[in-house]
Amino acid sequence: MQPVLFRTLSLGVAIAAASSSAFAATLDGGAVAAPDEYGAKVAAQILKAGGNAVDAAVATAFTLAVTYPEAGNIGGGGFMTLYMDGKPYFLDYREVAPKAASKTMYLDDKGEVIENLSLVGAKAAGVPGTVMGLWEAHKRFGKLPWSELLTPAIGYAQKGFKVADKQFQYRQDAVALFNGKTNFGDYFGHMKAGEAFLQPDLAKTLERIADKGPDEFYKGHTADLLVAQMQQDKGLITHQDLADYKVRWREPMRVDWQGNTLYTAPLPSSGGIALAQLLGIKENRAADFKGVELNSARYIHLLAEIEKRVFADRADYLGDPDFSKVPVARLTDPAYLKQRAAEVNPTAISPTEKVRPGLEPHQTTHFSIVDADGNAVSNTYTLNWDFGSGVVVKGAGFLLNDEMDDFSAKPGVANAFGVVGSDANAIEPGKRMLSSMSPSIVTRDGKVSLVVGTPGGSRIFTSIFQVLNNIYDFHLPLEKAVAAQRVHHQLLPKDTIYYDAYAPLAGKVAEELKAMGYTLEDQGWNMGDIQAIRVDGKALETASDPRGRGVGLVVKP
């Protein structure tokens, strides 16, 4: 059986229009890179109708909740990085722990983690944020009427969409995992490859949200259905949890490098801090990379040396900034990055046990959008695993997340991605769980030049890091930069480098890495699903990762 995975969707859009902004960018048309053909078509449709980047993002997110149910959602949460009228913004609509959650809720009487309790079933679900997040983004920046943006998704739910072969395989794996544990099979058991899949209950839910806005989801009939499902399945989410949910507008993480500015996710995502550290440490070791061939054994070793230090810091320090004091400034300080860079061994593996925190003590979906005014949206949202917790809200037709696994159920014990955490990411009521989602926007001279994101759990920021290297250091065309081999190392398991079947480590490179002492492992799923748009003057370029089933389109005015 194929492993059930964590998925992320990615989409990018741009369109030409008149603008009065000082950061205006009149483009040759629009563009979209989305994780499936339906999301791409809807984004293009909204742009042609005069919608802006946020309008296209909202419509695409709701569409993917229908056509990409393994990750697209209204029962999960996410992050959105925006660049509007020359100013960066970050919207945190991550799920939160229910009020009844506790630090020991996934432990047995002996204090050990109960297998799969934080991954499968109603108790794995955090309070969803997607509907409120999309509403708040639209309320602040949208142009087209809210109800119009849900119309395409409602149509696909009512009339169906053609199930892709790969999507059907994910469904098969999920049925095996959830069999007898959730009601997943009642809703998705009749899905067949190549045939239309209809979701009438979900269509009615989306119609109610289109008509009444987020109050329908958090306080209306949909909320009643969700709470009834929780009570039936012994979950924790209550009416009060839903009514109290709020998004957070935060200052985006900013990284300046090579004349570019990267805007990406701040805490409670680890991705922004990680990207700042990865880029900063690499810059301090520039001499080691000089003349080194892309994805050679030496190049991969240098990446592993940097990545293991970033993951050591992630495990010890990072969590929800509303609950824990996180030393962000110190972790990204140039002097600290120089110190960490000095620890890198360019020729041999640094012993894992000596790589400590440097200070004193799946499935996810992403889309990216750029409009003619130079505005951009980079959005990542998720259910965590493929099809989340496997629990479908009866009568409402949507899946609930299993994001509670992103907390540290027990400090020092790995989650489903093999990533460990500390008390900074321990479970507390109302707390946002740590994430790796890293929706990113690159600007140069105040104008958007790249919008990029990917799924992949702990592989998200290492994948984006490698794509940035491919573009800015190796000067690869966007499609080749996205398609190139990617690898991953995260400190633990010890001296292990992961690859995927799309671009396996083999031949001379593999032998050289093994000779250095590395263990090479096929992780069993794709190393991300990058969706990217590049803006060069007026020209638009899209790239949809060949590892997935995404589509890139240029939209002419």
Swiss-Prot record:
GO terms for molecular function: glutathione hydrolase activity; leukotriene C4 gamma-glutamyl transferase activity. Residues 1-24 form the signal peptide. L-glutamate binds at R94, T382, N384, E403, D406, S435, S436, G456, G457. Keywords: Acyltransferase, Glutathione biosynthesis, Hydrolase, Periplasm, Protease, Signal, Transferase, Zymogen. The keyword Transmembrane helix does not apply. It is found in: Periplasm. Its EC number is 3.4.19.13, 2.3.2.2. Pathway: Sulfur metabolism; glutathione metabolism. It catalyses: an N-terminal (5-L-glutamyl)-[peptide] + an alpha-amino acid = 5-L-glutamyl amino acid + an N-terminal L-alpha-aminoacyl-[peptide]; glutathione + H2O = L-cysteinylglycine + L-glutamate; an S-substituted glutathione + H2O = an S-substituted L-cysteinylglycine + L-glutamate. The active site is at T364. The keyword Hydrolase applies. One of its GO terms (biological process) is glutathione biosynthetic process. SUPFAM superfamilies: N-terminal nucleophile aminohydrolases (Ntn hydrolases). GO terms for cellular component: periplasmic space. Cleaved by autocatalysis into a large and a small subunit. This enzyme consists of two polypeptide chains, which are synthesized in precursor form from a single polypeptide. Belongs to the gamma-glutamyltransferase family. This is Glutathione hydrolase proenzyme. It comes from Pseudomonas aeruginosa (strain ATCC 15692 / DSM 22644 / CIP 104116 / JCM 14847 / LMG 12228 / 1C / PRS 101 / PAO1).
